[in-house]
């Protein structure tokens, strides 16, 4: 048996294993980065839609904040010359099969061509907190006292991107929150 040939095969095998490990690590990190960017894009799309809707609260005659709670807000606003209702709410009992942490966030109201539309988004959390002051320090549950509204949204990837140290799946996540002070609600 040739010792040089055996050593060459051993070194070649180790080199091949190290290249495969490197390739695996690059692919895993690429997947994590892509998942993270997708979640950030989803949050950005939700941010734009929610921001556009929140600016309309109290806009027009008979426009009003109809009701709200921790995970729901419904209001009427004047859109293209008509009073229309818009609501954002978590759908109870809904879940996404690939990620048990996600529930369905539903937006109902006019969209694009003025027809009512129902848009659904998988989210981890959607929270509405109303305040009776513009600074967002005094919470209120009375819709007539609302002067500012804090909206918080958290999303996660549909598929796990790895495992936590305890063995549970790890999902890419991104969140956003903003305090809205609708001009038509400030007196």
How should these model regions be labeled?
Residues 31-32, 38, 54-79:
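Short, glycine/small-hydrophobic-rich surface segments
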Residues 2-56:
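Aliphatic-rich helix starts adjacent to a transmembrane/signal segment
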Residues 44, 68-69, 145:
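An alpha-helix initiation/capping motif
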Residues 67-138, 170-175:
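Type IV pilin-like appendage domain
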Residues 125-187:
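Short linear sequence signals and composition-biased patches located at protein termini or domain-edge surfaces
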């Amino acid at each position: 048996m040739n010792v040089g040939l055996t050593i060459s095969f051993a070194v070649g095998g180790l080199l091949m294993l190290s290249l495969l490990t490197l390739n695996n690590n690059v692919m895993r990190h690429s997947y994590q980065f892509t998942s993270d960017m997708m979640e950030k894009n989803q949050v950005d799309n939700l941010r734009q839609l929610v921001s556009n809707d929140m600016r309309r609260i109290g806009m027009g005659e008979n426009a009003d904040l109809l009701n709200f709670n921790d995970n729901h807000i419904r209001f009427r606003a004047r859109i293209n010359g008509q009073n229309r209702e818009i609501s954002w709410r978590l759908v109870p009992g809904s879940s996404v099969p690939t990620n048990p942490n996600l529930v369905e966030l539903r937006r109902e109201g006019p969209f694009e061509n003025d027809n009512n539309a129902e848009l659904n988004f998988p989210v981890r959390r959607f929270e509405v907190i109303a305040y009776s002051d513009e600074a967002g320090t005094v919470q209120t549950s009375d819709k007539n006292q609302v002067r500012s509204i804090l909206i918080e949204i958290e999303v996660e990837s549909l598929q796990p991107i790895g495992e936590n140290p305890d063995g549970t799946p790890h999902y890419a996540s991104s969140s956003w929150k903003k305090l809205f002070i609708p001009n038509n609600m400030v007196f």
